[in-house]
């Protein structure tokens, strides 16, 4: 009986130690609505960061993962710790001399989530759309190995897909293209193999509502392509790796052609503002 109690005590101690060693990631939930309150984006911060979008109760984007992989095995968005949040109401006029209108009204609600790992995540909710972007708060220059931008739009929803028009089969081979093609109209899970698509891309969602995926404020950073080689419900981002060597070529020798690439996508300054994902 005494030996049984000793063994039972050992088991209890072992289980206690195991429970202590298991990491616990408390979930944090955030919600942001458009000024007219018809659009709502929900953000969940746990082991990963996901967000979803609903319009008048209809889900137009299912929970989708976003993150950035930084050099040295670090991440923006993996096991991230929230330090604070800030909410703003934006109501301003933007002068636009190169657009069809000379002024644009910029009205939205904004949520800024700050993280211990050295970045902010900004969400904006407009009456007609949602956008997010990463902002670095790091004090030194750094390298971005990869960015994860997923769009869980539903496997059977139909999409208008602008595939890259090229004979190249590899992903890096498809990067050299004219960004011109007709749109293929097909269900998301009928995506054509390893083909990449450029932006914008449109998906028909619940109750005949449309979701357009694009980006903005793109500077010193690769443009986003989309792929769905798994033929499932989620479109995934793909970014051109950073050029390592180039040669002169193309039409009339007017272009620089990438002949070799590095194993990362961007070299960034401290406190970089990354492109908006819209």
Language-model features: where?
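N-terminal accessory beta-strand-rich subdomains and adjacent acidic, glycine-rich linkers
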Residues: 29-278
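Bacterial Sec-dependent N-terminal signal peptides
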Residues: 1-29
């Amino acid at each position: 009986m005494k030996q049984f109690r000793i063994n039972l005590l050992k088991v209890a101690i072992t289980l206690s130690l195991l429970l202590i060693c298991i990491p616990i990631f408390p979930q944090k939930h955030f919600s942001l609505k458009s000024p007219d309150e018809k659009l709502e984006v929900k953000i969940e911060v746990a082991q990963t960061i996901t967000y979803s979008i609903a319009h008048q109760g209809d889900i137009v984007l299912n929970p989708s993962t976003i993150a950035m992989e930084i050099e040295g095995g670090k991440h923006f968005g993996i096991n991230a710790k929230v330090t604070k949040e800030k909410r703003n109401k934006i109501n301003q006029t933007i002068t636009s001399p190169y657009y069809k209108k000379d002024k644009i009204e910029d009205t939205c609600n904004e949520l800024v989530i700050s993280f211990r790992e050295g970045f902010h995540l900004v969400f904006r909710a407009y009456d007609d759309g949602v956008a997010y972007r990463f902002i670095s708060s790091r004090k030194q220059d750094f390298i971005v190995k990869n960015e994860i931008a997923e769009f869980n739009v539903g496997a059977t929803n139909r999409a208008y897909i602008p595939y890259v028009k090229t004979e190249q089969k590899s992903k890096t081979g498809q990067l050299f293209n004219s960004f011109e093609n007709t749109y293929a109209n097909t269900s998301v899970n009928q995506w054509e193999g390893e083909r990449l698509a450029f932006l914008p891309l449109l998906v028909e969602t619940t109750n005949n509502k449309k979701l357009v995926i694009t980006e903005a404020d793109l500077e010193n950073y690769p443009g986003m392509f989309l792929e769905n080689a798994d033929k499932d419900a989620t479109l995934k981002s793909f970014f051109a790796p950073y050029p390592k060597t180039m040669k002169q070529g193309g039409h009339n020798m007017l272009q620089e052609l990438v002949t070799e690439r590095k194993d990362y996508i961007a070299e960034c300054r401290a406190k970089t503002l990354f492109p908006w994902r819209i």
